[in-house]
């Protein structure tokens, strides 16, 4: 048997008609929902994804998306062109018709998002700091240099060079609080304003800041 060669071809090269040129019942076709499909060993299941989850899943399947201008913004725009996004886990694609029908009968609006532009530098590296345990009341923290970021549905995806980091909960709130230098008290106030009061909120913020410093996503202002 002759070996096969894998190649990349544009739809037009394969004779595939662009959807913008197709109609149904006299109306132009449009994309109704956006799915990220994954083959599994058993069963067919459709689940909603947050935009941040969809971004990280999509990024894992690419090798050079970070070379795009504003890479996360470019992907977020693509992933919100239609309802969803959704995760389709399938073992038999031919048995997914009912799931697709449900999407058409109950369309979902795409999520909103906020773009937080970074430096655009794809050569950045995550550099951890161990200063969290010795922070004083007057010490101030700010976001470490990053390439691009997207905030949506209480989650933030931060791209540092070629590495995406998904933050949620207090992590997302604390990172979002630091476009300019903030003390721990100011970060705590912003996290509580975003997520609500909690009897252990100070401990939670302290631990979160330590984690963000160790991950290289926040840095202490010298």
Task: Write out the residue ranges for each language-model feature.
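A broadly tuned preference for mixed-charge, low-complexity surface segments
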Residues: 81-99, 148, 152-155, 199-219
């Amino acid at each position: 048997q002759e070996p096969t060669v894998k190649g990349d071809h544009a739809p037009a090269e394969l004779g595939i008609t662009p959807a913008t040129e197709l109609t149904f019942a006299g109306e132009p076709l449009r994309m109704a929902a956006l799915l990220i499909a994954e083959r599994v060993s058993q069963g067919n299941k459709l689940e909603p994804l947050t935009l941040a989850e969809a971004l990280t899943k999509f990024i894992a399947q690419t090798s050079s998306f970070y070379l795009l201008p504003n890479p996360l913004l470019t992907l977020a725009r693509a992933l919100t062109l239609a309802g969803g996004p959704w995760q389709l886990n399938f073992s038999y694609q031919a048995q997914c018709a009912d799931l697709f029908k449900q999407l058409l009968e109950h369309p979902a609006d795409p999520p909103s998002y906020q773009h937080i532009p970074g430096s655009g530098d794809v050569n950045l590296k995550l550099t951890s700091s161990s200063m969290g345990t010795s922070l004083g009341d007057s010490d101030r923290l700010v976001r470490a240099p990053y390439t691009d970021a997207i905030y949506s549905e209480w989650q933030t995806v931060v791209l540092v060079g070629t590495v995406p980091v998904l933050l949620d909960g207090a992590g997302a709130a604390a990172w979002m609080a630091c476009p300019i230098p903030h003390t721990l008290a100011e970060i705590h106030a912003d996290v509580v304003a975003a997520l609500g009061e909690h009897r252990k909120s100070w401990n939670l913020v302290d631990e979160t800041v330590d984690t963000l410093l160790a991950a290289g996503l926040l840095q202490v202002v010298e």
